[in-house]
Structures are given as C-alpha cells and as structure tokens.
C-alpha cells in the first residue's frame, strides 16, 4: 500500500531526527516536512473513511488538519530564519518547537529561559514562578529582530522598540492568591516590591519598581537553573500584546522541584488539582482553610522512582559483561517499528529488563549507509527475567526476536 509506505518513511525520518542531537536549522526543517507529510496522509485517509493505515491509527480530521497546519507554519518560519543572520546560532529542536513558539510571548522564537519568583503577602510559602527569556526573536515585515524580556514589579515584559509590552501581570495572581495586595519579585540578584514603600521605590517612572543593588550593598538572590516549557500545559496562555490588569483567567501554576545535583524541572499543577508532571507518581490534594486564599506553593508532590533492578549500576553507567556473561535479546525489523517498540518498553515495562540500547544498523563497506534491519539489544539480570519478559510483553509479529548470551572469551 503506497500510502502506508509513505507514512512509514515520514515517521522513520521523524524518529531519526528526534534522536539526532542536531543544532542545524536544515534538520529541523526536514523534521517539520516529515511531520507535514505524515498529517497530510492522515487527513486524506480520514477523508476516505479509513481509521488505520497498517498498524497506525488515523487521527480525526480536525487533529490531522491542525497538526499539518502547525508543521507548515514552522517549516515556512524556519526557512525564513535560515536566510537571516541568526541562522548561525545553535538551534535545538526544542528551541523551534511549535509549543514554545506559541508560548507567551506568542508567535516568537525564544531561547535561554530563567525563572522569576514572586512572593505574595510577604509569605515565603505563598509564591509562584514565571518564565522569562533572555533571547526573544521576532519576525517582522523588515526581517528578524532580536530582543529580550525582563521583569519588574508590574509583570514580565518584552522590550519592543524601547517600550515594554507585558505578557504577564503579577496583579492578577495577587488577587487570586493574596489578601493584602502586596508582592515581591525576585529575578536573579534583583528584587522589586509592590506597592513601593516610598516615592524612591519608583524606577523608570513606573510605580512599584524597587531594584536592589547588584553589588554587595544589598541582598542578592541566586537565580534558579533554567527550565524549558515543553508543552502548552506548562505555559501561560496569553499573547504578546499588553495586558489589562482587570482581566482574570484560570491558568496553570508552574512549580520547580530540585533533583539530584541541584538540577530543577518544572512541574505543572492546576489551581484545583494535584500536581501533574513527568516526575509525579503520587500526589496528595491539599486542603485550604476557609479564611485564606489558595497558595500557589501549597501543593505537595513526590518524585517518581522508576522501578529498576537491584543489579543496576549507578545512573548513567552500563556494564554489558558484568559477572562475566549477560543474557540478552536481539529484536530486529523495520526501523520505525523497532523504535516504537523501544519507546513502549521503556514507558510501560521498565522493570522487566536491565538495559536497552538505541536502535542501530549495520553499515556498508563504504560510507555510513544503513544496511539490513533496525536492531535493539535488551539485557537482563538472568535467564529467568528474560523468560518472564518474553512471556508477558507483546512484541509485534513482524519483528524477529533472538535469545543470545554475551560472554567474554
């Protein structure tokens, strides 16, 4: 079936580019081209009444159309960026994702994020966090322009032609989470207060901007490590234009949590739900006293611990021949299907094996052209675990499975 083959080729291209740590805009343009082809095929198939192509389910017409339009938008945008002086910058696929492009300030490319902390009512437990971008790329009729975003006591803004265009207003959350109408903004080694304690607290003619010294004369605040929003649920859904302080909305709150080594991630929680994110395995709903507004920082969460075997090395280490020999499985077949299987195994069956490799191929006598099928190698603690894995995990029939044992001479 020609459509199924074209779909498989487009998905194979996407998987290859997703696994490739590229900073080249040309690779990202190819990725969105493959994404565009995939959703165009889905749209045509759904129009004909098909619900699947091969083993791949076909999304609804609306979903396929929206995904195709997003891919076309990003493909054209990156082609335009490729012709600009900024094409020489290192652009990761995450930097040019459609989700980040639409995140506030919307319809801009953004890099180098940092976290701004806001404390309401002078209560260290009543705080929330916002994302600020050191580099904001705006496409205008005159070409691409590089600007920055910043924070003050009013909110977070983008500098556009010497004026501040706010895309986040702290007063909105102060009405929801505070009682006194006061808050403190901490941006790296700068602090701003609202309302100002005196006329001297006004900076640049804007009320409430109290900037503390950058040197040793005043308190400093070390900025948290950058955290990048990867999906619309982690971004504040608002546009690039200025905001009306009287406008209210129900937005998601973003919580940074500290991992080992001091690294931080963003975990999003709704105002009325438990924390949800890639690290939350068990969350407890919080209760609020009737006389106090909900605190943005009042939700607790636990770090999820991926179940792994006791035979595992420390994180990041891999020893194929620990103990002298290792029972394994080789799974071979269509590269895209093998990659999809590996993703499913890591997501749903992580406790059933020891380690799993990336997808690899044999190469020809010259160059790096791939030959044969895509292959993954799965290792186990012993043959019993391997037998349990093969007996409980469903593997597509078109993929071949070989039991092998690797040992030293």
UniProtKB/Swiss-Prot annotation:
Pfam families: PPV_E2_C, PPV_E2_N
Biological processes per GO annotation: DNA replication; DNA-templated transcription; regulation of DNA replication; viral DNA genome replication
Superkingdom field: Viruses
Stretches for region Transactivation domain: 1-199
Parts forming coiled coils: none
Record's keyword terms, sorted: Activator, DNA replication, DNA-binding, Early protein, Host nucleus, Phosphoprotein, Repressor, Transcription, Transcription regulation
Biased composition regions of type Basic and acidic residues, renumbered to the chain: 300-315
Summary of the function given for this chain in its UniProt record: Plays a role in the initiation of viral DNA replication. A dimer of E2 interacts with a dimer of E1 in order to improve specificity of E1 DNA binding activity. Once the complex recognizes and binds DNA at specific sites, the E2 dimer is removed from DNA. E2 also regulates viral transcription through binding to the E2RE response element (5'-ACCNNNNNNGGT-3') present in multiple copies in the regulatory regions of the viral genome. Activates or represses transcription depending on E2RE's position with regards to proximal promoter elements including the TATA-box.
HAMAP family, per the entry: PPV_E2
Homology family: Belongs to the papillomaviridae E2 protein family.
The name this protein goes by in its record: Regulatory protein E2
């Amino acid at each position: 079936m020609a459509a199924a083959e074209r779909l498989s080729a487009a998905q194979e291209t996407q998987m290859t580019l997703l696994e490739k740590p590229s900073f080249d805009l040309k690779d990202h343009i190819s990725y969105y081209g493959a994404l565009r082809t995939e959703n165009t095929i889905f749209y045509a198939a759904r129009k004909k009444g098909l619900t699947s192509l091969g083993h791949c389910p076909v999304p609804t017409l609306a979903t396929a159309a929206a995904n195709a339009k997003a891919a076309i938008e990003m493909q054209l945008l990156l082609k335009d960026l490729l012709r600009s002086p900024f094409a020489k910058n290192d652009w990761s696929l995450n930097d040019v994702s459609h989700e980040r492009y639409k995140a506030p300030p919307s319809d801009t490319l953004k890099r180098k994020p940092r976290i701004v902390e806001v404390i309401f009512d002078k209560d260290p437990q009543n705080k929330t966090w916002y994302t600020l971008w050191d580099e904001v790329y705006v496409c205008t009729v005159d070409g691409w322009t590089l600007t920055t975003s910043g924070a003050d006591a009013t909110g977070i803004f983008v500098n556009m032609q010497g004026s501040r265009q706010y895309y986040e207003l702290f007063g909105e959350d102060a009405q929801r989470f505070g009682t006194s109408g006061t808050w403190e903004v901490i941006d790296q080694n700068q602090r701003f207060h609202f309302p100002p304690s005196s006329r001297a607290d006004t900076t640049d003619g804007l009320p409430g901007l109290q900037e503390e010294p950058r040197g040793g004369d005043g308190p400093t605040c070390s900025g948290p490590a950058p955290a990048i929003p990867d999906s619309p649920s982690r971004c504040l859904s608002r546009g690039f234009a200025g905001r009306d302080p009287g406008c209210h909305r129900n937005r998601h709150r973003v919580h940074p949590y500290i991992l080992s080594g001091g690294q931080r991630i963003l975990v999003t929680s709704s105002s009325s739900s438990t924390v949800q994110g890639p690290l939350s395995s068990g969350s407890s709903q919080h209760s609020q006293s009737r006389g106090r507004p909900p605190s943005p920082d009042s939700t607790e969460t636990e770090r999820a611990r991926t179940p792994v075997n006791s035979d595992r090395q420390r994180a990041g280490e891999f020893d194929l021949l620990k103990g002298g020999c290792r029972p394994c499985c080789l799974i071979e077949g269509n590269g895209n299907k093998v990659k999809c299987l590996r993703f499913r195994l890591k997501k749903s069956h992580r406790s059933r094996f020891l380690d799993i490799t990336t997808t690899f191929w044999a190469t020809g006598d010259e160059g790096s052209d791939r030959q044969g099928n895509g292959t993954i190698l799965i290792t186990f603690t012993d043959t019993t675990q391997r037998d349990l894995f093969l007996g409980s995990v469903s593997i597509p029939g078109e993929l071949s499975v070989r039991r092998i044992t690797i040992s030293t001479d």
